[in-house]
Amino acid sequence: MDSKESLAPPGRDEVPSSLLGRGRGSVMDLYKTLRGGATVKVSASSPSVAAASQADSKQQRILLDFSKGSASNAQQQQQQQQQQQQQQQQQPQPDLSKAVSLSMGLYMGETETKVMGNDLGYPQQGQLGLSSGETDFRLLEESIANLNRSTSRPENPKSSTPAAGCATPTEKEFPQTHSDPSSEQQNRKSQPGTNGGSVKLYTTDQSTFDILQDLEFSAGSPGKETNESPWRSDLLIDENLLSPLAGEDDPFLLEGDVNEDCKPLILPDTKPKIQDTGDTILSSPSSVALPQVKTEKDDFIELCTPGVIKQEKLGPVYCQASFSGTNIIGNKMSAISVHGVSTSGGQMYHYDMNTASLSQQQDQKPVFNVIPPIPVGSENWNRCQGSGEDNLTSLGAMNFAGRSVFSNGYSSPGMRPDVSSPPSSSSTATGPPPKLCLVCSDEASGCHYGVLTCGSCKVFFKRAVEGQHNYLCAGRNDCIIDKIRRKNCPACRYRKCLQAGMNLEARKTKKKIKGIQQATAGVSQDTSENANKTIVPAALPQLTPTLVSLLEVIEPEVLYAGYDSSVPDSAWRIMTTLNMLGGRQVIAAVKWAKAIPGFRNLHLDDQMTLLQYSWMFLMAFALGWRSYRQASGNLLCFAPDLIINEQRMTLPCMYDQCKHMLFISTELQRLQVSYEEYLCMKTLLLLSSVPKEGLKSQELFDEIRMTYIKELGKAIVKREGNSSQNWQRFYQLTKLLDSMHDVVENLLSYCFQTFLDKSMSIEFPEMLAEIITNQIPKYSNGNIKKLLFHQK
């Protein structure tokens, strides 16, 4: 029997072979055959059995596995075998090598066979090889019968087609089974990808594949179902897939719009899709969506991969959340809300689905697509960054009504403990920034003593002023005062309080002014003629810090001499102790001078020269002040543990020097010099002697000196008030400053003598010895110019 006659029974329409393949033989449409499609006409150029036997060496054998795709009971199997034996005895044996080869999905025209379905990820069954002598199919029938005995009938019967690449049973191997043609045709029309026509390959009594209608297969994925069924009803969608020469275009590339969303393949065990309205699309087992791959006009292919963003190098593109065709700004009911992604500006966004049913799925990923640069892209990007019109909100600020709850259970991203608000919006949300303390930069609690300060600096300033503490900085009077280090150096903190303008009398003055205003208001109500008159205080205290206030802060503390009074006194031991004490006092004087406002602006050489010329002035005047304050000018208080009384003054070489020093304390006692006056006079003594050739910064020096002369006048006015005795007192104080030159000259002459006379064996500290060594030549040459207030 000819192969054409076996494949094309009488009374059936034939389909031209040009629809299936061109040029190189034909391939049987396995998909249509299983669905009852059109008959296939095999051309005469098909390879013969001999050709198939010659290609046996290049092909591998295949094991046909129907155990997971079909099942029947033992009784039906026996009936099938009996019917097959009867048909073989009654009818002559046809040459079905070509038909069987084609029905198994093998292209016998080429040695390289192509098994359909491997590109889609389905399990490959292998390749079929036919030997030249295997024209009898009894072994095949026995293997199929044995496999059918071991299989069981699965539940939920549904019609499906075998996977491409698996061999299909022939007419001799299965009995004929009758079915309803109308229902069968209706089922074919309802399935996507089928022929859907009324043309059948065989008649009812000659149909080879009607047995498939009685077989029940699972419609699920082979890898996901328990039975691992390889039969799929919707594997081959396009009929051109069976022919490699059907068209020039790649059958796997489908047309799609640029802005169309690319949906991933959703299997039965994966999460559902989301519609534009936020509803869940439930995928049925019979309609399993295949992965779609779209082609565009650009030179790249956009693949749909869940949770993966494809980035291109050819142009500026950006990632946009997929909203199923809706605009990211125009449609407020978008499917994805963005919040929780950290950016470089400190803002945080998170990605959540706008569906209440998906809020419980923590691992749900949004679908993204790569959008090529379009004219609207820059506008959307600017809107996402917060620019644009006021009625448009950014992604981070979107709060849709359809989103009932976020994936983490918080109703808004602001309630998340791990989400911090942007720094730029903190000030606008909480109002103006808090006011800071002008001393330590802490948060200010109010205006205290005329300055906006915190409570800690307020208490510190009050205690420092009322306690009359003489703080001394251990550094260079430039310590950093902030919230953390404000307690390290009280001297620098007190100085900064004065620089900020804190004044203890500001609070009292404020109360006085308030009381005066209340009294004025009461008097104005009683007498109408005084209603237009206002009472103004005579002089308001200056709230800005004065130089005298700064001088109070930087005043050095009193040093101890470490003299042992239990040991009998001697002139040598007292003078040696005084020299050691003088060396430490010189060091403190250097620190004090550098802290004087304006002194460090001078040239460094000028600073050293002024200190070398004035060190004895500073020590003698400070000694007179301590003696005046502690002993009323009758004793010399060098240190709290070293006081020169009348008995010690009688020691050899002590009386003449003590007499000059007592003169200073006596004058201070007579004039009743105040502390502010003393500070200004001490600063002027630092600036009382200069070289004859002048200083390198002479103009600045004269300006600084004149400034402190005016400060001395202010201190006098503060002490005496507005009286005619101010100029007289100024004359007396400046006269005392001029007399200091004579006292210091006598003290220096004795100091130089003891320093040069090695027989006296009086020790000098290193720093003091260096100063004396540098100063002796200048005094001997007369290279010193005295700055006097009055002429002799």
UniProtKB/Swiss-Prot annotation:
SUPFAM superfamilies: Glucocorticoid receptor-like (DNA-binding domain), Nuclear receptor ligand-binding domain. A zinc finger (NR C4-type) spans 437-457, 473-497. There is a cross-link at residues 294, 310 (Glycyl lysine isopeptide (Lys-Gly) (interchain with G-Cter in SUMO2)). GO terms for molecular function: core promoter sequence-specific DNA binding; DNA binding; DNA-binding transcription activator activity, RNA polymerase II-specific; DNA-binding transcription repressor activity, RNA polymerase II-specific; Hsp90 protein binding; identical protein binding; nuclear glucocorticoid receptor activity; nuclear receptor activity. Residues 501-792 are annotated as: Interaction with CLOCK. There is a cross-link at residue 435 (Glycyl lysine isopeptide (Lys-Gly) (interchain with G-Cter in ubiquitin)). Residues 148-162, 176-193 have a biased composition (Polar residues). The gene is Nr3c1. The lineage of its organism: Eukaryota, Metazoa, Chordata, Craniata, Vertebrata. It is found in: Cytoplasm; Nucleus; Mitochondrion; Cytoplasm, Cytoskeleton, Spindle. Residues 75-94 have a biased composition (Low complexity). This is Glucocorticoid receptor. Its main location: cytoplasm. T-cell is a critical cellular target of GR, as immune activation in mice lacking GR resulted in significant mortality. This lethal activation is rescued by PTGS2 inhibition but not steroid administration or cytokine neutralization. The keyword Nucleus applies. Receptor for glucocorticoids (GC). Has a dual mode of action: as a transcription factor that binds to glucocorticoid response elements (GRE), both for nuclear and mitochondrial DNA, and as a modulator of other transcription factors. Affects inflammatory responses, cellular proliferation and differentiation in target tissues. Involved in chromatin remodeling. Plays a role in rapid mRNA degradation by binding to the 5' UTR of target mRNAs and interacting with PNRC2 in a ligand-dependent manner which recruits the RNA helicase UPF1 and the mRNA-decapping enzyme DCP1A, leading to RNA decay. Residues 503-538 are annotated as: Hinge.
